[in-house]
């Protein structure tokens, strides 16, 4: 076959269409709110270390009001289908940032946590911090964006109880069509002929498998058959929410339980299920008029029960005619009546449904069907406890507008697997023609049926998160038009995980100053001083600055009295974030700046001896530095005709600079030898990537009688380019500089050779 190299460069475009028609309910996102909603200026959005009025956000942030959304759009995962409401979020990343070494940061109530351990029914709001200016205060770990989840709190006096139950069916739209045995065998023979090999399957074998007269001797397995899989499985969930309080304290609690089934309908797998029970409690206390405190805690009990064996992996590789001459399950009706030895084996065998025995061959003494029936079961158990508390002190007696806030959290998570591991016997049949029928005349036993009754424990993990932050806040207005706010923050966290020596740590100081004049002209400056133990002493600190400017055109005289424009604002931001989450060489993240020396034994000067020698495996580079995210973004948002149409759009261009390379091609080649395998080459900052794109979220909102209608579309479009690469390949097509980061590279067929002459004049090909 003639072939040529072809590169496929894909540009990502994500668009979602959402249509909501709730009765008497409101769907609010950062871009939408209905006519009966209170002033948008009072709608507060959680961003880094503070809440900001939605209309005062200077771009790069989107928010979803999950509490109201759940009243009309029930979902089961905290980030489920959020790309339908948020431009710039595709379900996996923000503004197309990669997750090669780490992805976006998830915070639940300000603490680094996993998004899958908080149920949608517990969530009040989710903020998507896409722009560098929105995450700069979080430091290095949020360099690829942050998703901030805020749980519900109690606001009402007295007692309020809400109980909700949901049931649903997960229906498989379709299953793959499994190739039949006869089709597979025919095509396999054809493939062997094409390779000038002899055929493996005879015409008689193909006929017997295709005829289906004896599926036990000539199996025709279909892993997606209704014999093994249901068309649907069920999910049941119940939630109780209790909130209330009085003058000095308010509380919110959430009790949730769900059970999820599976598609399997045979063996131990028919009992597969996942169960989760959780309890959350959030308490707000006014200790005095100037001192307020809060306590949040949650406990989660998660269990997943499953049969042994990897069915889906087997379904992707198992041949329909396999194993030869023996289906995984064979009926005892196929044993010849006078095969006494075989019947003696069956008298002590562990039969399935009282009449089927596990079959196989000597080369295949186990299979996934036998595993599911007889190998036992396993259960994954996870327990999580999360606790955080904080206090806010109003220092207005010291300085008007000044306050102090501190936040502490500790989370524990443990998980392990328990299993009953059984062994089983399979029986190898010998077939013969008895009175014109295929019958089993002999059986050979492979393995033993054993059930120890012991429960085994494996895969134990213990994880812990410790978090602390303290901050001074200042917020004041001068002469009714000069609005000034500032924050001085010290924060850090450590996450320890089983089997990892180094903890995932973050420590940084941050400062933010915001000013707006009469909510018309805005300026915001953010600065983070970060620390990373992954770099050499003297190079472990860096400053990450950000500056944003905004202009609310609506408050200008030429738009102030407009009946069309409700609001219109543009903003521009420039940021540089220093990050260490991409300081990695494979699985190694620490001491990459150090040289590595090792020793080994080599040839000696006389027979029977060996000498020890020392060699370098890596050179030193104490100037190894942070990777930098340099970004410029522009945001435009508007509301027209009394919120009939809303639009929030952003343009961004960012450059990720200083990715690591471990074998620089511009170093002399003698610094890297093949034998002995030695290198004096250090790890360097070199490679750069660039992303340019835009996102948007447009909504149409209309109230028709008692029905609020909202129709929206969100989209993200961006291009990627490897702007700098250390490469010195023989062929130009092998180089990646100047090409897309998300390209798919490979050979494209140029067609089949048409003649012997064309083959002779073409280059030699090898793969």
Describe these PLM feature segments.
Residues 5-7, 16-45, 49-104, 111-121, ...:
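Membrane-proximal, glycine/serine-rich, low-complexity loop/turn segments characteristic
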Residues 77, 755-756, 761:
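Alpha-helix N-cap recognition
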Residues 108-111, 615:
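Short gly/ser/thr-rich secondary-structure transition/capping motifs
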Residues 112-113, 356, 438-440, 766:
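Short, solvent-exposed loop/turn motifs
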Residues 126-128, 134, 272, 668-679:
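Solvent-exposed beta-strand/loop surfaces of large extracellular or lumenal domains
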Residues 170-174, 416-425:
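Short, solvent-exposed beta-strand-terminating loops
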Residues 282-291, 297-301, 333-335, 341-344, ...:
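Extracellular/periplasmic, surface-exposed regions of secreted and cell-surface proteins
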């Amino acid at each position: 076959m003639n072939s040529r190299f072809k590169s496929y460069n894909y540009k990502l475009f994500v668009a979602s269409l959402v249509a909501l028609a709730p009765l008497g309910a409101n769907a609010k996102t950062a871009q939408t709110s209905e006519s009966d909603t209170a002033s948008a200026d009072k709608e507060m959005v959680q961003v880094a270390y503070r809440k900001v009025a939605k209309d005062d956000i200077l771009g790069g942030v989107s928010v979803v009001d999950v509490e109201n959304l759940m009243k009309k759009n029930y979902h089961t995962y905290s980030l489920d289908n959020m790309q339908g409401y948020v431009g710039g979020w595709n379900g996996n990343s923000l503004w197309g940032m990669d997750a090669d070494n780490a992805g976006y940061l998830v915070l639940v109530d300000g603490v680094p946590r996993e998004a899958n351990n908080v149920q949608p029914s517990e969530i009040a709001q989710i903020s998507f911090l896409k722009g560098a200016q929105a995450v700069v205060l979080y430091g290095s770990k949020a360099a690829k964006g942050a998703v901030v989840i805020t749980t519900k709190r109690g606001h009402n006096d007295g007692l309020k109880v809400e109980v909700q139950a949901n049931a649903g069916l997960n229906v498989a739209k379709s299953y793959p069509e499994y190739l039949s045995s006869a089709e597979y065998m025919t095509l396999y023979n054809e493939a062997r002929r094409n390779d000038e090999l002899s055929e493996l399957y005879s015409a008689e074998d193909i006929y017997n498998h295709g005829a289906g007269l004896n599926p036990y001797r000539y199996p025709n397995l279909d892993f997606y058959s209704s014999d093994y899989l249901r068309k649907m499985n069920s999910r049941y969930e119940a939630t109780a929410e209790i909130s209330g309080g009085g003058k000095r304290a308010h509380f919110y609690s959430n009790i949730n339980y769900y059970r999820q089934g599976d598609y399997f309908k045979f063996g131990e797998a028919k009992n597969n299920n996942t169960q989760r029970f959780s309890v959350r409690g959030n308490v707000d206390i006014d200790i005095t008029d100037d001192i307020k405190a809060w306590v949040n805690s949650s406990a989660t009990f998660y269990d997943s029960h499953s049969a042994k064996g990897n069915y889906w992996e087997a379904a992707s590789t198992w041949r329909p005619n396999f194993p030869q001459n023996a289906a995984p399950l064979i009926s005892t009706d196929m044993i010849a009546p006078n095969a006494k030895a075989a019947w003696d084996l069956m008298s002590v065998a562990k039969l399935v449904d009282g009449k089927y025995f596990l079959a196989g061959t000597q080369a295949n003494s186990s299979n996934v069907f036998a595993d599911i029936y007889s190998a036992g079961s396993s259960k994954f158990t996870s327990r999580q406890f999360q606790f955080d508390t904080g206090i806010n002190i109003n220092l207005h007696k010291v300085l008007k507008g000044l306050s102090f806030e501190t936040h502490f959290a500790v989370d524990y998570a443990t998980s392990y697997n328990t299993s009953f591991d059984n062994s089983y016997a399979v029986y190898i049949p010998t077939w013969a023609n008895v009175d014109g029928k295929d019958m089993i005349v002999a059986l050979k036993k492979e393995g033993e049926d054993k059930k120890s009754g012991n429960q085994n424990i494996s895969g134990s993990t213990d994880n812990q998160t410790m978090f602390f932050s303290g901050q001074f806040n200042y917020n004041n207005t001068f002469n009714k038009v000069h609005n000034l706010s500032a924050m001085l923050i010290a924060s850090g966290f450590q996450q320890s995980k089983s089997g990892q020596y180094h903890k995932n740590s973050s420590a940084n100081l941050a400062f933010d100053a915001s000013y707006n004049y009469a909510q018309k002209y805005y300026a915001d400056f953010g600065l983070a001083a970060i620390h990373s133990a992954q770099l050499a002493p003297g190079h472990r600190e860096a400053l990450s600055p950000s500056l944003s400017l905004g202009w609310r055109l609506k408050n200008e005289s030429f738009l102030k009295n407009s009946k069309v424009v409700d609001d219109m604002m543009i903003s521009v931001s420039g940021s540089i974030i220093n990050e260490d989450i991409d300081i990695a060489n494979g699985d190694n993240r620490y001491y990459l700046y150090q040289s590595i020396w090792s020793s080994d034994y080599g040839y000696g000067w006389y027979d029977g001896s060996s000498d020890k020698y020392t060699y370098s495996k890596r050179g030193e580079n104490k100037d190894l530095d942070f990777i930098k995210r340099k970004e410029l973004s522009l945001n435009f948002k508007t509301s027209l005709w009394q919120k009939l149409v809303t639009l929030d759009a952003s343009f961004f261009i960012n450059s990720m600079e200083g990715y690591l390379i471990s074998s620089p091609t511009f170093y002399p080649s003698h610094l890297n030898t093949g034998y002995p395998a030695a290198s004096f080459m250090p790890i360097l900052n070199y490679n750069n990537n660039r992303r340019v794109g835009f996102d948007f979220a447009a909504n149409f909102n209309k109230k028709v009688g008692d029905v609020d209608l909202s129709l929206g579309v969100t989209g993200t479009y961006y291009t990627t380019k490897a702007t700098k690469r250390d490469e010195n390949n023989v062929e130009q097509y092998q180089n990646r500089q100047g090409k897309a980061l998300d390209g798919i590279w490979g050979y494209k067929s140029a067609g089949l050779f048409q003649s012997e002459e064309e083959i002779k004049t073409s280059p030699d090909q090898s793969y």
